[in-house]
């Protein structure tokens, strides 16, 4: 009798995706983050669903409904802490996943990469509207500052901003629609994840060497299911440590105060995972220029496949490109630090230099390094 998992219409899909999937024999722990992101998404949807059962999206009661969840709902404090810190884990895994893709040349699978960039943008949008929901000071002012950027668009900007707000400022209508967006977007993300996997399974996984792995493949189960389980254990351990021992360490103290449109916080800043983009936005003194730089900082990922000049796919055997990659990593950490600092010297100039070097590294230095490495590898006799 033929195995049911190989014949049943639904189980056959699962089998080809997670069980009998041929995977390269040499993929490292850097390939764990895809499955970890799937787990993060499931955790966020489940905890979010339970939070939505008790949350009210009204400016008068939103803040107190979150307090009610933490005080009066059974394990509400835990669900909220898991959801808030789960977002941080989600972005940590996302950044490592994208970094892996850049280092090992996975971006040459263009369809998978482009869907991945769309996923990144959608997750960022979801996190932004979600941060507004508790209706604390930083929620309100963060929403005000970021939605106000739309008004920088020539001619239609102000109309567009008011259309998003549903009013003449961030108010009740804004909160209600942001809750609606925050509820629907994770399901759109889930659909995009399926498309992402569909394109990935058309080509198969890349591997650290960047060489075609077709001659040496192993079944996904049990080899990579057990390897993913180890990564999952570390993820859950870190998330639980954060949520149980230090749940507010990544949040902003200003968000413990209810939103007050008459009182501006001294430093308006987003959550840590947006600080690098926020630093790039602030580094340009012109409003429209800042908005364009902000968009470019993420959308630049879409042109990375066209900037690949090296004869080798992976950076595994390309020391100059490796050095530039780690400089880029340090640069992003610097931008994250600057994004959380007040707008004063020396932070302004450091932010501007880091922003310039971010674009220089990706657009100029890394493609040149690839060409130079090609030249160095040419036989000279």
Swiss-Prot record:
Example of a GO biological process term: mitochondrial electron transport, ubiquinol to cytochrome c
InterPro entries membership: Cyt_b/b6_C (IPR005798), Cyt_b/b6_C_sf (IPR036150), Cyt_b/b6_N (IPR005797), Cytb/b6-like_sf (IPR027387), Cytochrome_b (IPR030689), Cytochrome_b_C_euk/bac (IPR048260), Cytochrome_b_N_euk/bac (IPR048259), Di-haem_cyt_TM (IPR016174)
Cofactor note: Binds 2 heme b groups non-covalently.
Top-level taxon of origin: Eukaryota
Any one GO MF annotation of this record: metal ion binding
Cofactors required: heme b
Alphabetic keyword roster: Electron transport, Heme, Iron, Membrane, Metal-binding, Mitochondrion, Mitochondrion inner membrane, Respiratory chain, Transmembrane, Transmembrane helix, Transport, Ubiquinone
Location relative to the cell: Mitochondrion inner membrane
One GO cellular component, as annotated: mitochondrial inner membrane
Residues that bind a ubiquinone: 201
UniProt xrefs under Gene3D superfamilies: Cytochrome Bc1 Complex, Chain C
CDD domains per UniProt: cytochrome_b_C, Cytochrome_b_N
Positions of heme b b562 binding: 83, 182
Membrane topology field: Multi-pass membrane protein
Positions with a binding annotation for heme b b566: 97, 196
Pfam families: Cytochrom_B_C, Cytochrome_B
Transmembrane segments: 33-53, 77-98, 113-133, 178-198, 226-246, 288-308, 320-340, 347-367
Function: Component of the ubiquinol-cytochrome c reductase complex (complex III or cytochrome b-c1 complex) that is part of the mitochondrial respiratory chain. The b-c1 complex mediates electron transfer from ubiquinol to cytochrome c. Contributes to the generation of a proton gradient across the mitochondrial membrane that is then used for ATP synthesis.
Other facts: Heme 1 (or BL or b562) is low-potential and absorbs at about 562 nm, and heme 2 (or BH or b566) is high-potential and absorbs at about 566 nm.
Subunit structure: The cytochrome bc1 complex contains 11 subunits: 3 respiratory subunits (MT-CYB, CYC1 and UQCRFS1), 2 core proteins (UQCRC1 and UQCRC2) and 6 low-molecular weight proteins (UQCRH/QCR6, UQCRB/QCR7, UQCRQ/QCR8, UQCR10/QCR9, UQCR11/QCR10 and a cleavage product of UQCRFS1). This cytochrome bc1 complex then forms a dimer.
Family listed: Belongs to the cytochrome b family.
Protein name: Cytochrome b
Source organism per UniProt: Planigale maculata
């Amino acid at each position: 009798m033929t195995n049911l998992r190989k014949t049943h219409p639904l189980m056959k899909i699962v089998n080809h995706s997670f069980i009998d999937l041929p995977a390269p024999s040499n993929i490292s722990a850097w390939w764990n983050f895809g499955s970890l992101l799937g787990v993060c998404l499931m955790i966020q949807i489940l905890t979010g669903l339970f939070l939505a059962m008790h949350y009210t999206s009204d400016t008068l009661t939103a803040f107190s409904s979150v307090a009610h969840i933490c005080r009066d709902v059974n394990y509400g404090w835990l669900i909220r802490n898991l959801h808030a810190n789960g977002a941080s884990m989600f972005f940590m895994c996302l950044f490592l996943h994208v970094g892996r893709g850049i280092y090992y040349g996975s971006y040459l699978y263009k369809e998978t990469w482009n869907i991945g960039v769309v996923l990144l943008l959608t997750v960022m949008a979801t996190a932004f509207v979600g941060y507004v929901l508790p209706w604390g000071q930083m929620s309100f002012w963060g929403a005000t500052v970021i939605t106000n950027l739309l008004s920088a668009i020539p001619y239609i900007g102000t109309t567009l901003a008011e259309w998003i707000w549903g009013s003449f400022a961030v108010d009740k209508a804004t909160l209600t629609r942001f809750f609606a967006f925050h509820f629907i977007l994770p399901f759109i993300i889930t659909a995009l994840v399926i498309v992402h996997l569909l394109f990935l399974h058309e080509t198969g996984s890349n591997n650290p060497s960047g060489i075609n792995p077709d001659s040496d493949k192993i079944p996904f189960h049990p080899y990579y299911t057990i390897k993913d389980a180890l990564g999952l254990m570390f993820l859950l351990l870190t998330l639980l440590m954060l949520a149980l021992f230090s749940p507010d360490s990544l949040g902003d103290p200003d968000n413990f105060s209810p939103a007050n449109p008459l009182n501006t916080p001294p430093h308006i800043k987003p959550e840590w995972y947006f600080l690098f983009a926020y630093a790039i936005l602030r580094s340009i003194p012109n409003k429209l220029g800042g908005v364009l730089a902000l968009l470019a900082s993420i959308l630049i990922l879409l042109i990375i496949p066209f900037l690949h000049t090296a004869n080798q796919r992976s950076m595994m055997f390309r020391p100059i490109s490796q050095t530039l990659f780690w400089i880029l990593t340090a640069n992003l950490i610097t931008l994250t630090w600057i994004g959380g600092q007040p707008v004063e010297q020396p932070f302004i100039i450091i932010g501007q230099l880091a922003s310039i070097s971010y674009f220089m590294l990706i657009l100029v230095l890394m493609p040149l390094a690839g060409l130079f490495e090609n030249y160095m590898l040419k036989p000279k006799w």
